[in-house]
């Protein structure tokens, strides 16, 4: 195993030597060196290289195609009733769970604290995003005669505040035995030139590693095992900042069950071709999502024979998975998508 001097020289992180020298105490110096030796520099280097590939060259190797979607308004009454019946049975059997991704801070909303604690000025009284979700789930529980398991993904940055926020608000009336928190992973921050970022306290600065790491976090924190123990077969994953999100949709889970698929998503059509939202498509023949910033300009306005956008189905973070799909994804290493902040 390489010591910290060899590590910093090998991975071109020599700027950290000055922080070691500037450490205010010997204890802080030793702690900082210990942090350095825990960093997976090889993984970081590979991620940095991946994020700085020539994007145009990468996209040239990707063949994009329109992906088929189901419009629920076009189902016959018999089809709709059949799908609803299947979906309702799954929910009534308590084989359905909800996961809320809430690892972010409310910074962009001008709010200090977890994003889920941000208060909206709704009628008849203001409510936090967490309260809105909790009350929506309570209504669904009452309708189906169950108590759905609710899993909430936090982050290292906001976990303690989030757990306290729920406790201070008596879990918004939700049965706390059915709420479980788990933390998403994190990664050291890199500057644009690939250097590790250090904060004012002489600690390597970390940030949440993205929503895509939710599956691995569910595995590592025992959430998948807990779901299996509770007989859960379908999991809906949504974001905390979508106050209008319908998390318990018998049509979605019923259609997924009827067609025997492992993953299903809800989508809405873009307001305009240039709306800044990722869209569903096929990438090299496989279902996927392409970010608005990555969509080739030649395809943005492309329409079909009916005049509808070929790439107009927005990805709005409304995704349903079977427990088998979650477990499969959790056991593979997904590629990272770089975020420049």
Could you describe each region identified by the protein language model?
Residues 28-30, 58-63, 146, 175-178, ...:
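Generic structural motif recognizing short loop/turn segments at the entrances and edges of beta-strands
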């Amino acid at each position: 195993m390489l010591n910290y001097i060899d590590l910093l020289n090998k991975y071109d992180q020599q700027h950290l030597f000055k922080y070691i020298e500037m450490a205010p105490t010997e204890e802080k110096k030793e702690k900082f060196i210990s942090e350095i030796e825990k960093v997976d520099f090889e993984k970081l280097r590979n991620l940095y290289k991946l994020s700085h590939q020539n994007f145009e060259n990468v996209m040239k190797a990707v063949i994009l195609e329109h992906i088929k979607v189901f419009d629920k308004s076009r189902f016959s009454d018999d089809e709709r009733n059949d799908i609803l019946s299947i979906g309702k049975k799954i929910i009534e059997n308590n084989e359905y769970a909800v996961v809320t991704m809430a690892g972010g801070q409310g910074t962009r909303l001008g709010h200090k604290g977890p994003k889920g604690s941000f208060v909206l000025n709704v009628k008849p009284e203001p409510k936090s995003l967490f309260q809105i979700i909790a009350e929506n789930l309570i209504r669904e529980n009452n309708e189906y005669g169950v108590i759905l398991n609710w899993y909430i993904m936090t982050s290292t940055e906001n976990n303690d505040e989030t757990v306290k926020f729920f406790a201070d608000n008596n879990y918004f009336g939700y049965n706390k035995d059915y709420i479980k928190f788990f933390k998403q992973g994190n990664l050291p921050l890199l500057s644009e030139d690939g250097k590790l970022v250090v904060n004012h306290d002489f600690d390597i600065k970390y940030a949440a590693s993205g929503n895509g790491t939710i599956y691995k976090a569910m595995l590592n924190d025992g959430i998948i095992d807990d779901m299996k123990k509770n007989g859960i077969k379908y999991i809906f994953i949504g974001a905390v900042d979508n106050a209008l999100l319908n998390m318990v949709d018998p049509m979605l889970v019923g259609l997924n069950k009827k067609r025997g698929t492992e993953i299903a998503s809800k989508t809405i059509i873009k307001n305009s071709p240039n709306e800044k939202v990722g869209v569903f498509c096929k990438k090299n023949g496989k279902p996927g999502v392409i970010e608005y910033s990555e969509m080739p300009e030649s395809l943005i306005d492309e329409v079909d024979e009916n005049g509808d956008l070929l790439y107009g189905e927005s990805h709005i973070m409304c995704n349903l998975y079977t427990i088998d799909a979650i477990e499969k994804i959790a056991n593979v290493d997904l590629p990272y998508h770089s975020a420049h902040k």
